A protein has these predicted regions:
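Short, well-ordered coil/turn segments that N-cap beta-strands
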Residues: 5-6, 47
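Glycine-rich beta-to-alpha active-site loop
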Residues: 42-86, 90
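Hydrophobic, secondary-structure "cap" segments at the distal end of domains
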Residues: 95-105
Length: 218
Protein backbone atom coordinates (compact mmCIF):
# COMPACT_ATOMS: atom_id res chain seq x y z
CA UNK A 1 0.00 0.00 0.00
CA UNK A 2 1.10 3.54 -0.79
CA UNK A 3 -0.73 6.13 1.28
CA UNK A 4 0.33 8.88 -1.13
CA UNK A 5 -1.82 7.28 -3.84
CA UNK A 6 -5.50 8.13 -3.49
CA UNK A 7 -6.73 6.68 -6.81
CA UNK A 8 -5.51 4.70 -9.81
CA UNK A 9 -6.11 5.74 -13.42
CA UNK A 10 -5.86 3.23 -16.28
CA UNK A 11 -5.61 4.93 -19.66
CA UNK A 12 -3.61 5.02 -22.90
CA UNK A 13 -1.21 7.52 -24.45
CA UNK A 14 -2.57 6.51 -27.86
CA UNK A 15 -5.85 7.60 -29.49
CA UNK A 16 -7.26 4.17 -28.61
CA UNK A 17 -7.75 2.63 -25.19
CA UNK A 18 -7.23 -0.97 -26.29
CA UNK A 19 -8.11 -3.12 -29.26
CA UNK A 20 -8.22 -6.24 -27.12
CA UNK A 21 -6.10 -9.37 -27.05
CA UNK A 22 -3.42 -10.29 -29.56
CA UNK A 23 -4.94 -13.58 -30.69
CA UNK A 24 -1.54 -14.75 -32.00
CA UNK A 25 -0.51 -15.11 -28.34
CA UNK A 26 -3.18 -17.77 -27.78
CA UNK A 27 -0.98 -20.39 -29.44
CA UNK A 28 2.11 -19.35 -27.48
CA UNK A 29 3.50 -20.58 -24.20
CA UNK A 30 2.95 -19.19 -20.73
CA UNK A 31 0.23 -16.49 -20.80
CA UNK A 32 0.18 -15.85 -17.05
CA UNK A 33 -1.18 -13.86 -15.49
CA UNK A 34 -4.40 -14.45 -17.39
CA UNK A 35 -6.64 -11.44 -17.98
CA UNK A 36 -9.46 -12.67 -15.69
CA UNK A 37 -6.94 -12.85 -12.82
CA UNK A 38 -5.71 -9.33 -13.53
CA UNK A 39 -9.26 -7.97 -13.67
CA UNK A 40 -10.12 -9.64 -10.37
CA UNK A 41 -7.16 -7.83 -8.79
CA UNK A 42 -8.28 -4.51 -10.31
CA UNK A 43 -11.88 -4.91 -9.21
CA UNK A 44 -10.95 -5.84 -5.66
CA UNK A 45 -8.42 -3.06 -5.18
CA UNK A 46 -9.28 -0.97 -2.11
CA UNK A 47 -8.57 2.37 -3.83
CA UNK A 48 -10.72 3.80 -6.64
CA UNK A 49 -9.68 2.60 -10.10
CA UNK A 50 -10.80 4.77 -13.01
CA UNK A 51 -10.61 3.76 -16.67
CA UNK A 52 -10.15 6.81 -18.89
CA UNK A 53 -10.86 5.98 -22.54
CA UNK A 54 -9.17 8.42 -24.99
CA UNK A 55 -10.41 6.27 -27.86
CA UNK A 56 -12.18 3.00 -28.71
CA UNK A 57 -12.05 -0.02 -26.40
CA UNK A 58 -12.78 -3.41 -27.87
CA UNK A 59 -12.75 -6.96 -26.56
CA UNK A 60 -10.41 -7.40 -23.62
CA UNK A 61 -9.86 -3.65 -23.59
CA UNK A 62 -13.51 -3.03 -22.77
CA UNK A 63 -13.43 -5.87 -20.25
CA UNK A 64 -10.60 -4.05 -18.46
CA UNK A 65 -12.73 -0.90 -18.31
CA UNK A 66 -15.75 -2.85 -17.03
CA UNK A 67 -13.67 -4.22 -14.15
CA UNK A 68 -12.64 -0.72 -13.05
CA UNK A 69 -14.72 1.11 -10.46
CA UNK A 70 -15.40 4.11 -12.71
CA UNK A 71 -15.24 4.86 -16.44
CA UNK A 72 -14.68 8.20 -18.18
CA UNK A 73 -14.68 8.85 -21.93
CA UNK A 74 -15.86 11.35 -24.56
CA UNK A 75 -19.09 11.65 -26.54
CA UNK A 76 -17.95 10.48 -29.98
CA UNK A 77 -16.27 7.33 -28.71
CA UNK A 78 -17.34 3.74 -29.40
CA UNK A 79 -16.76 0.47 -27.59
CA UNK A 80 -17.54 -3.15 -28.32
CA UNK A 81 -17.10 -6.85 -27.61
CA UNK A 82 -16.41 -8.33 -31.08
CA UNK A 83 -15.29 -11.80 -29.95
CA UNK A 84 -18.31 -13.48 -31.57
CA UNK A 85 -16.82 -12.58 -34.96
CA UNK A 86 -13.88 -14.84 -34.10
CA UNK A 87 -16.23 -17.68 -33.18
CA UNK A 88 -15.76 -17.21 -29.43
CA UNK A 89 -17.27 -15.11 -26.64
CA UNK A 90 -15.85 -12.55 -24.21
CA UNK A 91 -13.73 -14.59 -21.82
CA UNK A 92 -12.63 -12.10 -19.16
CA UNK A 93 -15.94 -11.32 -17.49
CA UNK A 94 -17.52 -9.28 -20.27
CA UNK A 95 -20.67 -11.42 -20.32
CA UNK A 96 -21.06 -10.93 -16.57
CA UNK A 97 -20.04 -7.30 -16.02
CA UNK A 98 -21.70 -5.63 -19.02
CA UNK A 99 -25.24 -6.83 -18.09
CA UNK A 100 -24.68 -5.44 -14.59
CA UNK A 101 -24.05 -1.97 -16.02
CA UNK A 102 -26.31 -1.96 -19.09
CA UNK A 103 -29.82 -3.33 -19.63
CA UNK A 104 -30.30 -6.88 -20.94
CA UNK A 105 -31.25 -5.81 -24.47
CA UNK A 106 -28.16 -3.63 -24.84
CA UNK A 107 -25.78 -6.19 -23.35
CA UNK A 108 -27.14 -9.03 -25.47
CA UNK A 109 -27.07 -6.96 -28.66
CA UNK A 110 -23.47 -5.87 -28.10
CA UNK A 111 -22.20 -9.34 -27.24
CA UNK A 112 -24.25 -11.37 -29.74
CA UNK A 113 -23.63 -9.09 -32.75
CA UNK A 114 -20.14 -7.89 -31.83
CA UNK A 115 -20.91 -4.48 -33.32
CA UNK A 116 -19.36 -1.27 -31.92
CA UNK A 117 -21.72 0.83 -29.82
CA UNK A 118 -21.73 4.56 -29.13
CA UNK A 119 -20.88 5.37 -25.52
CA UNK A 120 -23.88 7.70 -25.49
CA UNK A 121 -26.07 4.58 -25.60
CA UNK A 122 -24.37 3.26 -22.46
CA UNK A 123 -25.19 5.74 -19.68
CA UNK A 124 -25.00 3.02 -17.05
CA UNK A 125 -21.52 2.01 -18.14
CA UNK A 126 -19.85 5.44 -18.19
CA UNK A 127 -19.84 7.68 -15.15
CA UNK A 128 -18.61 10.77 -16.98
CA UNK A 129 -18.73 11.58 -20.70
CA UNK A 130 -16.76 14.61 -21.87
CA UNK A 131 -17.96 16.55 -24.88
CA UNK A 132 -14.51 16.39 -26.54
CA UNK A 133 -11.43 14.16 -26.06
CA UNK A 134 -9.24 17.17 -25.28
CA UNK A 135 -11.39 17.79 -22.19
CA UNK A 136 -10.81 14.30 -20.78
CA UNK A 137 -7.92 15.21 -18.48
CA UNK A 138 -9.70 18.19 -16.96
CA UNK A 139 -12.98 16.30 -16.57
CA UNK A 140 -11.24 13.26 -15.07
CA UNK A 141 -9.54 15.43 -12.44
CA UNK A 142 -12.89 16.99 -11.55
CA UNK A 143 -14.55 13.57 -11.37
CA UNK A 144 -11.77 12.21 -9.16
CA UNK A 145 -12.19 15.15 -6.82
CA UNK A 146 -15.90 14.32 -6.47
CA UNK A 147 -15.32 10.76 -5.27
CA UNK A 148 -15.85 10.13 -1.59
CA UNK A 149 -17.36 7.65 0.83
CA UNK A 150 -18.95 4.41 -0.40
CA UNK A 151 -19.22 5.74 -3.96
CA UNK A 152 -15.44 5.92 -4.30
CA UNK A 153 -15.13 2.18 -4.94
CA UNK A 154 -18.01 0.76 -7.01
CA UNK A 155 -17.40 -2.89 -7.82
CA UNK A 156 -19.42 -4.14 -10.77
CA UNK A 157 -19.28 -7.66 -9.34
CA UNK A 158 -21.31 -6.51 -6.32
CA UNK A 159 -24.36 -5.68 -8.45
CA UNK A 160 -27.01 -8.41 -8.16
CA UNK A 161 -29.26 -9.25 -11.10
CA UNK A 162 -32.41 -11.36 -11.30
CA UNK A 163 -34.35 -12.82 -14.20
CA UNK A 164 -37.57 -10.80 -14.26
CA UNK A 165 -40.45 -11.63 -16.57
CA UNK A 166 -39.49 -8.69 -18.79
CA UNK A 167 -35.85 -9.79 -18.96
CA UNK A 168 -36.90 -13.36 -19.77
CA UNK A 169 -38.91 -11.96 -22.65
CA UNK A 170 -35.83 -10.14 -23.95
CA UNK A 171 -33.81 -13.37 -23.84
CA UNK A 172 -36.53 -15.30 -25.66
CA UNK A 173 -36.79 -12.68 -28.41
CA UNK A 174 -33.02 -12.38 -28.88
CA UNK A 175 -32.61 -16.17 -28.89
CA UNK A 176 -35.31 -16.64 -31.54
CA UNK A 177 -33.83 -13.91 -33.71
CA UNK A 178 -30.30 -15.27 -33.28
CA UNK A 179 -31.30 -18.82 -34.22
CA UNK A 180 -32.70 -17.51 -37.50
CA UNK A 181 -29.71 -15.32 -38.29
CA UNK A 182 -26.82 -17.50 -37.10
CA UNK A 183 -27.39 -20.33 -39.62
CA UNK A 184 -25.64 -22.95 -37.52
CA UNK A 185 -22.91 -20.61 -36.25
CA UNK A 186 -22.98 -21.56 -32.58
CA UNK A 187 -20.93 -18.76 -30.97
CA UNK A 188 -23.85 -16.28 -30.83
CA UNK A 189 -26.01 -18.80 -28.95
CA UNK A 190 -23.12 -19.52 -26.57
CA UNK A 191 -22.95 -15.77 -25.95
CA UNK A 192 -26.63 -15.72 -24.98
CA UNK A 193 -26.12 -18.67 -22.65
CA UNK A 194 -23.20 -16.89 -20.97
CA UNK A 195 -25.12 -13.63 -20.49
CA UNK A 196 -28.07 -15.58 -19.07
CA UNK A 197 -25.73 -16.70 -16.30
CA UNK A 198 -25.40 -13.09 -15.16
CA UNK A 199 -29.10 -13.22 -14.22
CA UNK A 200 -29.37 -16.77 -12.91
CA UNK A 201 -26.02 -17.42 -11.21
CA UNK A 202 -23.80 -15.70 -8.68
CA UNK A 203 -21.03 -13.54 -10.13
CA UNK A 204 -18.40 -16.19 -9.36
CA UNK A 205 -20.45 -19.01 -10.88
CA UNK A 206 -21.29 -16.81 -13.85
CA UNK A 207 -17.57 -16.36 -14.53
CA UNK A 208 -17.04 -20.11 -14.32
CA UNK A 209 -19.92 -20.66 -16.74
CA UNK A 210 -18.46 -18.04 -19.10
CA UNK A 211 -15.10 -19.82 -18.99
CA UNK A 212 -16.71 -23.19 -19.72
CA UNK A 213 -18.65 -21.81 -22.69
CA UNK A 214 -15.55 -19.99 -23.94
CA UNK A 215 -13.63 -23.29 -24.04
CA UNK A 216 -16.54 -24.97 -25.85
CA UNK A 217 -16.08 -22.40 -28.62
CA UNK A 218 -12.35 -23.10 -29.03
Amino acid sequence: KNDSVSAIVITSSLPIFSGGADISEFSGGDLSPMLPEVLDKIENTSKPVIAVLPGPAFGGGLEVALACHHRVTFADNKVGLPEVNLGILPGAGGTQRLPRLADAQTALTMIVTGKPTSVLKLPGVFDKISDKPEHLLEDTKAYLASLSGPNAVKRTCDITLSMSEETQGVFEAVTAQTKKASKGFFAPLKCIEAVRGAYTLSFEDGLKNEGKLFMECM
